[in-house]
Regions:
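A detector for small-residue-rich transmembrane helices and their helix-helix packing motifs
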Residues: 1-200
Length: 200
């Protein structure tokens, strides 16, 4: 395994371990927690307007990005993280990728809670869509030629990943859209700084 992929790999391992711990600790029928979510860890890690903005449990803006509603939610997000995260890590390095993912997750969760004050949110897609938006800017900044960096399978899966999220409710759609827009803005900012560095 190449060093440039280690941050994405270890972050995925951490997310999977959180899922396993959540299932093991229970908080309900473990089989259904495995399939559809729930559990003690989810209850202590999800983000909502009331828990974070009213009760001051700010860590939830970060922990919510490491929790999932069942194994299918987990697998879908980890496949996307591997494809997107590794490429962002190659372009920016492991530290910047991790910072952008985690801060992006927190900002996306914060804005989501403002839009849906009665709801709660979890899922790595909060940060993944930030990385996706940023990666799209970087790839299209090459006149579209950057898309060749993705295999046909990867392009197909990412299209499926985006479309599938649209069938999971308005909350998911809004969360993905917020993250994607944040990622686009970050991508343009990085390109601008890169250009200034070359001309400065």
């Amino acid at each position: 395994m190449k060093k440039r992929k280690l941050a994405t790999f270890y972050m995925a391992i951490a997310i999977v371990l959180v899922f396993i711990i959540n299932v093991a600790l229970g908080g309900g029928n473990r089989f259904w927690i495995f399939l559809t979510g729930g559990g003690y860890v989810k209850d202590y890690g999800e983000a909502s307007f009331k828990l974070v903005l009213e009760q001051g449990q700010w860590w939830r803006f970060l922990t919510c990005g490491y929790l999932h509603m069942g194994v299918f939610h987990l697998v879908g997000n980890m496949a996307a993280l591997e494809m997107i995260g590794t490429r962002v890590e190659r372009k920016l390095g492991p530290v910047k990728m991790l910072v952008i993912y985690n801060l992006g997750t927190m900002l996306t969760a914060f804005l989501w809670c403002l839009v849906f004050p009665e709801g709660w949110t979890i899922g790595a897609s909060l940060g993944i869509f930030v990385l996706l938006g940023m990666l799209c800017v970087m790839l299209f900044s090459k006149g579209g030629k950057g898309l060749t960096e993705l295999s046909r399978y990867e392009r197909g899966y990412l299209v499926f990943y985006v479309i599938a999220g649209c069938f999971l409710g308005i909350g998911t759609i809004v969360g993905h859209l917020i993250g994607f827009v944040i990622g686009i803005l970050v991508g343009f900012a990085i390109i601008k700084m890169h250009l200034q560095g070359r001309t400065g």
